[in-house]
């Protein structure tokens, strides 16, 4: 951002005599031009044309060229005619003076009205309400912006909390899934062990059946042998043991042993089955609990994802609202800056108009004073003052230099003119 100032100055010379220089001539030739006043609508842009009156006296013996005192009292027909002509011209001149005074008064009224309407005023009370409204708008905008920033911060913190919770729940979910994978592997191992035990039981059953069949074959064979060898031999030896009884006892022993083995096998099998059944039940319960936990965790994750998505949407909407608000207030600030620049330009224009009107008023006042001095001179001529000096008739030539300095201030941002203001200063010398 840079500032550039350019100063333009112009000078003009205001003053000088509104009369032509007096010189000796054969006749008294006054020349005059009536003043005219032209004003635009609203009293602005007034243009004033001041009459210039010059008179060249003759018939006074060429006294205006080098004589300081002129005696107007003398005899002769030429002097009477000259005085009569002078009186007539003075009457017309006084009439013009009255018209100029009336025009001057009218112009003063217009200047006063214009000054009251558009002139600089020290009463800034009408602008206080606008300033207070603008301050209130700026304060409300700042407060709303702070609230939006606070809401965004709260939403960001809530999103961070939900992200942390989501990561924690995700870690728990991963650990539970790992436990479930381990339990599934354990269930597979248990199923393999159960199948092996079932196969072993089947093999033991087949072996038991084979043993029973062999035992039955042995018993049958022994019975057949006993039946075939039924020979009665009587000796004096002591009475032999009863083979049937012995076989019965053997059969009973074998049956008891087989039954014992069968009972042992059944007990062992039943214990193994019960043990594996308990383990399977425990594994099944753990699997059901893990499945329910996984289902709950999935529902929790879904709800957290939905809530996170809603928070993201809310954050996006808040950011969009913030951008829209910033853009709107930037436009409003730009409009207010343009209004302030326009008011500054209008103030500069009003000051320039006031200075110009003051200069015009001063010029009119100088003209009026010169006209009054000329009227006073004519009155002295009419009264026949013998001590009339030519320098009294010739108005004093005053030269006034008016220097106008125009200062232009431009505010440049990135090579573009953002604001521009003009300040006009009038210097008199």
Curated annotation (Swiss-Prot):
Region: Head, residue numbers: 2-78
GO cellular component entries: intermediate filament
Pfam families assigned to the protein according to its UniProt record, in alphabetical order: Filament (PF00038)
Keywords: Coiled coil, Intermediate filament, Keratin, Phosphoprotein
InterPro entries: IF_conserved, IF_rod_dom, Keratin_I
Annotated region (Linker 12), positions in chain: 223-246
Region (Tail): 386-429
PROSITE patterns in the record: IF_ROD_1, IF_ROD_2
GO MF, any single term: structural molecule activity
Family of the protein in this entry: Belongs to the intermediate filament family.
Miscellaneous comment as given in the Swiss-Prot or TrEMBL entry: There are two types of cytoskeletal and microfibrillar keratin: I (acidic; 40-55 kDa) and II (neutral to basic; 56-70 kDa).
Subunit (UniProt): Heterotetramer of two type I and two type II keratins. Keratin-18 associates with keratin-8.
The protein's name in its UniProt record: Keratin, type I cytoskeletal 18
Organism: Xenopus tropicalis (Western clawed frog)
Gene field: krt18
């Amino acid at each position: 951002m840079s500032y550039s100032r350019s100063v333009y100055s112009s000078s003009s010379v205001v003053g000088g005599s509104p009369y032509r220089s007096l010189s000796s001539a054969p006749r008294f030739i006054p020349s005059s031009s009536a003043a005219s006043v032209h004003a635009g609508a609203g009293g602005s842009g007034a243009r004033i044309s001041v009459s210039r009156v010059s008179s060249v006296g003759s018939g006074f013996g060429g006294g205006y060229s080098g004589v300081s005192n002129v005696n107007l009292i003398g005899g002769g027909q030429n002097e009477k005619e000259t005085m009569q002509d002078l009186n007539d011209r003075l009457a017309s001149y006084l009439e013009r003076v009255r018209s100029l005074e009336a025009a001057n008064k009218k112009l003063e009224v217009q200047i006063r009205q214009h000054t009251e309407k558009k002139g600089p005023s020290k009463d800034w009370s009408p602008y206080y309400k606008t300033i207070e409204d603008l301050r209130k708008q700026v304060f409300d905008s700042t407060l709303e912006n702070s609230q939006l920033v606070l809401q965004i911060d709260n939403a960001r913190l809530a999103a961070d909390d939900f992200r942390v919770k989501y990561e924690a729940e995700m870690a728990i979910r991963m650990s539970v899934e790992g436990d479930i994978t381990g339990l599934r592997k354990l269930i597979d191992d248990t199923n393999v062990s159960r199948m092996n035990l079932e196969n072993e039981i089947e093999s033991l059953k087949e072996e038991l059946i084979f043993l029973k069949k062999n035992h039955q074959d042995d018993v049958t064979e022994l019975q057949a042998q006993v039946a075939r060898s039924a020979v009665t031999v009587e000796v004096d030896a002591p009475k032999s043991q009863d083979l049937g009884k012995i076989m019965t006892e053997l059969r009973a022993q074998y049956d008891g042993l087989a039954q014992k083995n069968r009972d042992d096998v059944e007990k062992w099998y039943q214990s193994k089955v019960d043990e594996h059944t308990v383990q399977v039940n425990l594994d099944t319960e753990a699997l059901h609990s893990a499945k329910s936990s996984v289902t709950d965790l999935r529902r929790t994750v879904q709800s957290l994802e939905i809530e996170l998505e809603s928070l993201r949407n809310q954050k996006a909407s808040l950011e969009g609202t913030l951008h829209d608000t910033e853009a709107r207030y930037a436009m409003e600030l730009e409009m207010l800056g343009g209004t302030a620049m326009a008011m500054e330009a209008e103030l500069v224009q009003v000051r320039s108009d006031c200075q110009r009107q003051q200069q015009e008023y001063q010029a009119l006042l100088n003209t009026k004073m010169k006209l009054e001095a000329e009227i006073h001179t004519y009155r002295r001529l009419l009264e026949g003052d013998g001590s009339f000096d030519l320098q009294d008739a010739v108005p004093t030539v005053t030269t006034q230099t008016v220097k106008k300095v125009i200062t232009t201030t431009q505010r440049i941002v990135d090579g573009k003119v953002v604001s521009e203001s003009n300040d006009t200063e009038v210097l008199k010398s």
